[in-house]
Amino acid sequence: MGVPSGLILCVLIGAFFISMAAAGDSGAYDWVMPARSGGGCKGSIGECIAEEEEFELDSESNRRILATKKYISYGALQKNSVPCSRRGASYYNCKPGAQANPYSRGCSAITRCRS
């Protein structure tokens, strides 16, 4: 009388999981179930990247990457320049006494303003 194939399969799977449990955190079976770090980095990209990796790109590469975005102005891409050196002033309106955020949407149904 032969041994059922289902029983052999169950024994093999059980032996596999027992060997994984015995390996513990040695990393021998990371290809099956990769270990995950519980915390991870929850800060900004600059805080999560190691300091030596953060500044690997030269300034020309950084300017080219920033130039592909539509919301970066040509003035912001100038080398060694500060957009507005006045403390607390908006980058868009650097005049003394100017509003920091002068943008205002008009009254429409989506803004739910009352007239």
From Swiss-Prot:
Organism: Nicotiana tabacum (Common tobacco)
UniProt-recorded name of the protein: Rapid alkalinization factor
PANTHER family given in the database record: RAPID ALKALINIZATION FACTOR, RAPID ALKALINIZATION FACTOR-LIKE
Post-translational events: Proteolytically cleaved, probably by S1P, a subtilisin-like serine protease (subtilase).
Pfam assignment, any one: RALF
Family: Belongs to the plant rapid alkalinization factor (RALF) family.
GO biological process: calcium-mediated signaling; regulation of signaling receptor activity
Disulfide bond residue pairs: 84-94, 107-113
InterPro entries per record: RALF
Record has Signal as a keyword: yes
Extent of the signal sequence: 1-23
Gene giving rise to this polypeptide: RALF
Site (Required for proteolytic cleavage): 63-64
Gene Ontology CC annotation, any one: extracellular region
Residue stretch(es) of the prosequence: 24-66
Phylogenetic lineage: Eukaryota, Viridiplantae, Streptophyta, Embryophyta, Tracheophyta
Protein role: Cell signaling peptide that may regulate plant stress, growth, and development. Mediates a rapid alkalinization of extracellular space by mediating a transient increase in the cytoplasmic Ca(2+) concentration leading to a calcium-dependent signaling events through a cell surface receptor and a concomitant activation of some intracellular mitogen-activated protein kinases. Prevents root growth and seedling development in heterologous system.
Keyword hit for Ligase: no
Keyword list, A-Z: Disulfide bond, Hormone, Secreted, Signal
Compartmental location: Secreted
